[in-house]
Amino acid sequence: MKQARQPAEREGGGVEQKTSSRSRYSMRCNMANCVSAHILIGGRLARSRYPELIEAIKADNPAVDWDGTPFDPDDIPVGKPLALMDHDVANGCFEEIEGICHRHGLHYVRWSGASPGSFPSVRIVYTGNGEPQPVLTTEEDEQVFSIERIRKLGSIETIEADYQRARRNPPPLVIVDDQPADVVILEITHG
């Protein structure tokens, strides 16, 4: 019969508990409103910063599809944004991932479902600088315009422009070398 592994004793007394990133994430969800959410990430990221993004993804623990397929750091999408999702996202926000995007100027669009009585379904658009822009949506990620918003925007053209801005996806995620390729400088001789 296999015995359960006992937690290790910590220096100075007490027991050290080992937790996986999934169980740490589950603990956060037990203390927060958890909803479905997905995020698209794009822009240019220096290769030396890619490990930071990987660690943030591990911390938030999303998948690459709704079936829960884990993210593989070697599978960077070609020609499109990185898509990540999960059914149990604390407060509908990928905190670590979004923090890395803010620090490194990466674009993202995040949609999260509503938590009745706490917060509405929303799409967040971040273009790599400034503040993330919230857009009210349905549970199917369709933009909702309140009468106040319609009045503020004023014309059908302005409403359509606002709609297009909110529906725009980030550019592809591109990992770039930190140092540009060696540049050969030709010396011009004056004669």
Where are these regions (language model features)?
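Positively charged N-terminal leader segments that act as targeting/secretion signals
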Residues: 2-14, 21
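Charged interaction segments
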Residues: 78-191
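N-terminal interaction modules that seed assembly of large macromolecular complexes
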Residues: 55-90, 95
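Intrinsically disordered/low-complexity terminal segments and short unstructured peptides
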Residues: 18-19, 188
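The N-terminal extracellular segments of secreted preproproteins, especially immediately downstream
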Residues: 12-13, 28, 100
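Polar/charged alpha-helical tracts
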Residues: 48-55, 59, 69, 74, ...
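Glycine-centered flexibility motif
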Residues: 1, 32, 37, 41-43, ...
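Short, extreme N-terminal segment that most often corresponds to the first beta-strand
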Residues: 22-65, 190-191
